[in-house]
Amino acid sequence: MAGATHQIQIRHILVENKEVADLLKETIENIPAEAGRVKMLMKLAGKYSICSASKDDGGNLGWLEVGWNKSDPRQPRGGFSKLNNDDLDDFMREGLEKMTLHKGRVFGPVESYEGFHVGMICQEVKLDRIL
């Protein structure tokens, strides 16, 4: 039996102030090419982000597995990957489910208990699993 899922790589900038988050988002969105937007996000994350876990890695939050039915007892070995911030994880999963988030497009600001997140899905990989 096989199952399909996909993984996304997320980068973000975390700031304390919504106005700053809005300015960062606007700055990134003004770059016409996707690769340029990713580079700008990485540069701005290194300069402005207060996220100690991702700041020095261009805002990289790692890979998130999505599209897998969590109630399926045949879950992937090791469980499901999840973002450490539940508010951001919920936002990402809901946005992907509703198809409002897309690779290369800037999202946010997303408010969480840590502050305001501006981010982007930078890469995605579709997977087929044999169970």
What are the language-model segments listed below?
Residues 13:
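Glycine-rich loop/hinge motif
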Residues 17-131:
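Peptidyl-prolyl cis-trans isomerase
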Residues 1-9:
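Acidic/polar surface patches and capping/hinge elements
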